[in-house]
Every structure is written in structure tokens, then in C-alpha cells.
């Protein structure tokens, strides 16, 4: 029986005090990118969600170097997901003995990094990738405007 070499490491951040939608806005920008490119993107983005995600990226890279002995140049973010966590509920005291509820949302962030030097499938897919660009047509068809009698006839 052949044992497959482990090529993925992950870092999990739970109960991060932030909305899941705000964290997803940043995660969608870094999914599928290399380690160095991700660090540059996160350091330049102006969102508050970048700092906890940056800490998770550092943690996943440290896990990869410690557990697999891989270098940071070979790491690619293969999976990044944000799930909603528990909602912290508090009461804010108001006038006349009343209180208003405050709901503080949390989220769970999972970062999975893959070492591309150990992964054979990634190397094969990278070599099969087409490098040609498709030429887009810049001419816009106006047949709908001409067939309908134009836009100026209607009041």
C-alpha cells in the first residue's frame, strides 16, 4: 500500500469578531493566489479584515514549513472559506429603564494552503494551460435599436 504524501496544510481562526460578509470581501481577492502575492495584496488593502486573515496566512505558512518542510515560494492558497459564527448578544441601557439589544457577529475563517512542488496534478495542469489570449470584438451591434424604429419615437 502506497501512502500519499500530505500536500495541504490549514489554519483555522474561530470566533473572530467581524461580520462574515466583510471577511468574505477580502477572502475572495486572495483565493487561488501564491503566498507572496497574497501578502502584498493584504498589506495594501484598506479593510479591517485584512489583519486577522494575514495572521492566518502566516500561521498556515509556518505550519507548512514545520510539518512538511516546504518553502514559502511553493505555497498556493487552494481553499479559503468564511463561515458565520455565533452572535454575541448584549443589552445596551437606554433612558427610562429600557434596554436595546446589541448583536455582535463573529465568523470562522479557514485557510488551506497547498505545496505545488509536492503536488503532481498541479504541475500537469499548469503545463497544459493555454497561454493565448482571445481577441474581443469591439464593434457593438445596434440592430435592436434600428429594428424597433429607434429610441426617439417613444415619448
Curated annotation (Swiss-Prot):
Keywords: Chloroplast, Plastid, Ribonucleoprotein, Ribosomal protein, RNA-binding, rRNA-binding. The keyword rRNA-binding applies. It comes from Nicotiana tabacum. Belongs to the universal ribosomal protein uL22 family. This is Large ribosomal subunit protein uL22c. This protein binds specifically to 23S rRNA. The globular domain of the protein is located near the polypeptide exit tunnel on the outside of the subunit, while an extended beta-hairpin is found that lines the wall of the exit tunnel in the center of the 70S ribosome. GO terms for cellular component: chloroplast; large ribosomal subunit. The lineage of its organism: Eukaryota, Viridiplantae, Streptophyta, Embryophyta, Tracheophyta. The gene is rpl22. GO terms for biological process: translation.
